[in-house]
């Protein structure tokens, strides 16, 4: 149940006693701020003098408001009354303390790509992190400090220009921490593991407004939880993570478009390609989709697949020979510096996958292998929608992600909160529906559930696993955070210790109020 702002306070202060001459704390005053009367003017008057002069405070009447509150999906949007953009890391605990004293809910935002239904229960102040965007490479050249507002694009470009790379999400527009606190899959995981596997330490603002340094020797229990379930425990203002020499000057990409008649051949070749944990570590990422392309056919979806290889075309094409043997209706390939690979694979800031402001209906499941029979059922279901509702079909994208997973599986499962290291493939059903079109929203939900069940039925005997960063919020706790009872108990224990009032409950929460 959604609690009212008057009954939910994240302030965990000392007992109040009546002392002669003492002022009454704001949260006991008769006219405390509530959701109904929260304005940027009042927040500026009360908070402005306590934070740095580069901190921005504004509300819905400001021309910047719509831009900074826009999200990847308009499904289950949080209700934002006031924006506060801290100018310094030290402003964040001050903002949190202010919110606590006034019973105001707060939500930290970097990329705005969360799609969890739980976000729709939020009503309060957005702490926009975009001004916290500095990167500092350490003298050793083995790590760097990153501030909490960074998205993937500037991290890739800055490090590359300095001769380095690190693990990031696959899409340029996603927040580094939004991805990393849930694990963080990306093109370097075959070599180096997940984003979270490379985090060395974090500066975290807890729910009570205190700041802690979290690493292997300080709050090591919380470090475990931050690596896979970190959205539940605090606001990360900065973090140190591993960086690596950038390697080859160019990467090779090869994109294919196949017709549906090639489906079984494609997926059988993919299973051989990935083998049993034998995907070459430099064959960093391959991703495919069922989607409409009416320049090829208006009667059924096409199969699009993209491969990215860390190295030369000559090396890559040896591995891609089985796919070159499958008759395609379109192919393109090239060799580009790594920062241009997202554009080549359709995951850049300017590509549709990064566009904000649509209504998305989604579902997801982790897989170990591709099941060609299940994929045929999914493809034929898509084809039926093309005939039944071309508008719904036009906005659909059934996505498949394959990685080199050696670096992920090399990390012990019990060493972090990230639960699904033996799963190798990520999937996402994603349908864009028109705003305020209830009938199509319901049809898209039904389709999303159908595809999820078909994917999962293709791996008999396995429980359903869902990547928390792709989870829509309707999965079970076990499906998002792991099926082992000890793992969930450890997360609950950390929650009780570090966030007893469950302030951080708006992104696929461990504890549901």
Give the predicted meaning of each segment.
Residues 2, 11, 15-513:
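Soluble FAD-dependent oxygen oxidases
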């Amino acid at each position: 149940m959604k609690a009212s702002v008057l009954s939910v306070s994240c302030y965990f202060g000392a007992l109040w006693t009546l002392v002669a001459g003492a002022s009454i704390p704001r949260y006991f005053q008769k006219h405390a701020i509530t959701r109904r009367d929260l304005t940027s003017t009042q927040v500026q008057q009360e908070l402005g003098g306590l934070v740095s002069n580069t901190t921005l405070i504004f509300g819905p009447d400001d021309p910047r408001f719509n831009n900074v509150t826009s999200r990847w999906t308009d499904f289950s949007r949080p209700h934002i009354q006031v924006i506060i953009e801290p100018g310094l890391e030290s402003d964040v605990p001050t903002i949190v303390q202010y919110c606590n004293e006034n019973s105001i809910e707060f939500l930290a935002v970097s990329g705005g790509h969360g799609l969890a239904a739980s976000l729709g229960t939020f009503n309060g102040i957005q702490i926009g992190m975009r001004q916290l965007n500095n990167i500092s490479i350490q003298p050793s050249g083995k790590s760097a400090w990153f501030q909490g507002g960074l998205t993937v694009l500037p991290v890739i470009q800055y490090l590359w220009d300095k001769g380095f790379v690190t693990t990031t999400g696959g899409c340029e527009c996603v927040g580094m921490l939004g991805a990393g606190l849930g694990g963080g899959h990306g093109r370097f995981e075959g070599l180096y593991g997940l984003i979270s596997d490379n985090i060395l330490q974090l500066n975290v603002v807890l729910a009570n407004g205190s700041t802690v340094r979290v690493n292997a020797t300080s709050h090591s229990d919380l470090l475990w939880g931050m690596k896979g379930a970190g959205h539940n425990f605090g606001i990360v203002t900065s973090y140190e993570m591993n960086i690596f020499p950038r390697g080859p000057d160019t990467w090779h990409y090869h994109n294919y478009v196949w017709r549906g008649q090639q489906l079984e051949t494609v997926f059988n070749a993919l299973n051989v390609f990935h083998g049993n944990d034998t995907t070459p570590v430099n064959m960093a990422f391959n991703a495919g989709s069922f989607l409409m392309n009416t320049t090829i056919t208006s009667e059924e979806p096409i199969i699009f697949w993209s491969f990215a290889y860390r190295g030369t075309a000559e090396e890559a094409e040896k591995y891609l020979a089985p796919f070159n043997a499958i008759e395609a209706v379109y192919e393109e390939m090239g060799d580009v510096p790594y920062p241009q690979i997202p554009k080549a694979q359709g995951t850049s800031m300017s590509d549709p996958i990064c566009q904000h402001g649509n209504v998305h209906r989604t579902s997801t499941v982790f897989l170990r292998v591709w099941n060609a029979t299940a994929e045929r059922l999914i493809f034929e279901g898509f084809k039926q929608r093309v005939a039944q509702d071309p508008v719904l079909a036009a906005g659909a994208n059934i996505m498949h992600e394959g990685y080199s997973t050696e670096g992920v599986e090399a990390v012990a499962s019990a060493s972090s909160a990230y639960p699904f290291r033996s799963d190798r493939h990520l999937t996402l059903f994603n349908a864009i529906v028109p705003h305020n079109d209830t009938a199509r929203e319901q049809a898209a939900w039904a389709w999303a559930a159908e595809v999820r069940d078909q994917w999962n039925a293709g791996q008999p005997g396995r429980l359903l696993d869902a990547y928390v960063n792709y989870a829509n919020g309707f999965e079970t706790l076990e499906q998002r955070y792991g099926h082992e009872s000890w793992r969930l108990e450890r997360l609950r224990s950390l929650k009780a210790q570090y966030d007893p009032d469950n302030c951080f409950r708006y992104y696929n929460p461990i504890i549901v109020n």
